[in-house]
Amino acid sequence: MSSGISESGSVWLEFMGSGVKETFYDAGGRRTRVLEAGAGQPLLILHGTGGHAETYQRNIGPLSQHFHVIVPDLLGHGFTDRPEVDYTLDDFADHLFALLDAMGIHRSHVSGESIGGCIAAWMTIKHPDRVDRLVLNTGILDRPDEKGLVQLADLEKRTQSLRDDCSLDTVRRRLEWLVLDRDTMTEEMVRIRHRIYNQPGMVDSVIRVMHAVLSMNRGLYCGHDYMARERMAEISRPTLVLWSDHNPGKPFDVIKPAIDLIPDAEVHIIKDAAHWPQFEQPDMVNGLMRQFLLRG
């Protein structure tokens, strides 16, 4: 085991007693893996680029005490199908609506981290009738500044390096980009992601999705300006924005004008966190989400 990696907070210890189950659904012909737990109003939670459902290991249990928590592996991620598509926000959103249909759910709360937040915003814009309340966690429809593009390019480089060396150390370096303190990252999370990435064809899929995400952040992609800031004004559902004080790629001062366009939004800055506040500061994030969503 490498030094600096904590063994605390194992996935199973976090899940014990919460009734978390792994289910595979047919979502519009795409085999889709979901971790779910709890009863009550549905809460769809979306991970970021290159992620998987275990991203929310510290949130599923606590939130499942109040909601039916649904955490899928996104299209092209984890153990969900990896079709030959462009991986636009439309592709992701359409797949998730198909998943909700397969589960017999018409309307839910939606929360997303990083590109998951962008997808959640896009779902709300496309079909506001299917979203109750929206939570954006370090993900928003807006472009990074020049410094942010450099930081995202660094993440892309770390991702591309997996093609030649998908070792534990390479996976660890990519995960460490996400957190403020690398000691926050557990060895178990590194090993989970290492196993996922070592599926045949998985690294190529992650690189393809990473290219799509960066292309959307840089400008037009597949003929659409998905990250146009003004689209945030089209969000008609109550919105909670959770940002961190050390978010790479899109710091708060850069994206605040986009937040200001949301008609009904409240904002909280999570201290001592980078791109994974739900993992770095789970008690704070779980509490804020619970309070906000229970108002709906």
Spans of features found by a protein language model:
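Residue in the alpha/beta-hydrolase core beta-strand immediately N-terminal to the catalytic nucleophile
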Residues: 73, 109, 132-135
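Short beta-strand immediately N-terminal to the catalytic nucleophile in serine-hydrolase-like folds
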Residues: 92, 110-112, 137
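Conserved serine/cysteine hydrolase catalytic core
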Residues: 202-256, 260, 269
